[in-house]
């Protein structure tokens, strides 16, 4: 009797266990969120790479915070490389010089110049000479042409506005052809290198971005016992930010307007923003437009830098 009772209890427990509802299924794990797309900026490599990396790191930190998207700086090796990167869409926005900006826009339909510094609507190039060359300061392009004839000379980058295009234009306006120089004109690759080459006497004279010259003077990085300014050009439009047309699709129709607002509120008097403005050598950014660079395009075509 006891054995039968035990068997019955076992049977009941088995039936109850078999009939119990299965445990609820676990909800599938949520898929990880896709990483936010980075907004990629670049710039012509017109100065020492270390200076550029420091400056653009400060800028991307500021932009990432203000825009709410990751902003990344992509350095390039030369002027042609950044024009190509903009053309193929490897970068979204680039800090171009006047000439490279025109070259880039002509290759990307719908690209827009949106911002420049306050100093870029009245920019200049500075001609410098080694004191050992005997070239003295002068007052106009005609005197410049006469003084440079028979001397060695270096530009900056081949595609630089302030380091090649406009200096060559004003040299020609004064009556000097490149064949009037001693040997072929050099191309240093950057404004900083132009200073060092002329300072060392490798070339008798050279031309560069006036803002870079002033900045290096201020920091005591120029030996004025060896090099001096001989002439400064009339003004022209130069550096500017250009944005690709597909940014509106990738980041929103109002993203360009957000960029303009973010840049134009930068203030050199703000301690947190001073590093950025000091790097750019300006007090503020202002809006610009493609039409402001029509003269640069015309001169580029005359000199053969734009086909």
Regions found by a protein language model. Name each.
Residues 20-21, 33-43, 47-58, 236, ...:
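An extracytoplasmic/periplasmic, membrane-proximal ligand-sensing/linker region
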Residues 73-84, 97-99, 178-196:
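Short helix-initiation/N-cap motifs at beta->coil->alpha
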Residues 86-87, 148, 198-199:
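Hydrophobic residues within well-ordered alpha-helices
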């Amino acid at each position: 009797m006891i054995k039968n009772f035990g068997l019955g209890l076992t049977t009941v427990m088995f039936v109850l266990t078999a009939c119990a509802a299965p445990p609820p299924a676990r909800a599938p794990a949520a898929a990880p969120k896709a990483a936010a797309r980075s907004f990629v900026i670049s710039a012509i490599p017109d100065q020492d790479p270390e200076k550029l990396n420091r400056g653009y790191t400060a800028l991307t930190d500021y932009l990432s915070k203000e825009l709410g998207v990751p902003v990344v700086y992509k350095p390039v090796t030369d002027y042609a490389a950044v024009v190509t990167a903009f053309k193929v869409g490897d970068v979204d926005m680039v800090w171009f010089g006047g000439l490279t900006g025109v070259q880039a826009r002509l290759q990307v339909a719908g690209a827009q110049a949106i911002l420049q510094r306050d100093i870029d609507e009245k920019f200049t190039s500075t001609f410098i000479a080694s004191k050992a060359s005997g070239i003295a300061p002068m007052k106009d392009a005609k005197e410049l042409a006469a003084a440079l004839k028979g001397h060695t000379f270096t530009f900056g980058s081949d595609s630089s506005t302030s380091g090649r295009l406009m200096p060559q234009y004003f040299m020609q306006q004064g009556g000097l052809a490149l064949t009037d120089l001693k040997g072929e004109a050099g191309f240093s690759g950057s404004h900083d290198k132009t200073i060092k080459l002329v300072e060392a006497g490798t070339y008798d004279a050279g031309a560069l971005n006036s803002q870079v010259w002033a900045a290096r003077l201020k920091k005591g990085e120029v030996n004025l016992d060896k090099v001096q300014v001989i002439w400064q050009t009339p003004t022209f439009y130069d550096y500017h930010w250009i944005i690709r047309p597909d940014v509106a699709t990738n980041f929103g129709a109002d993203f360009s307007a957000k960029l303009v607002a973010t840049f134009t509120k930068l203030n050199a008097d703000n301690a947190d923003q001073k590093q950025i403005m000091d790097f750019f050598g300006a007090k503020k950014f202002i809006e610009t437009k493609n039409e402001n660079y029509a003269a640069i395009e015309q001169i580029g075509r005359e000199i053969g830098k734009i086909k």
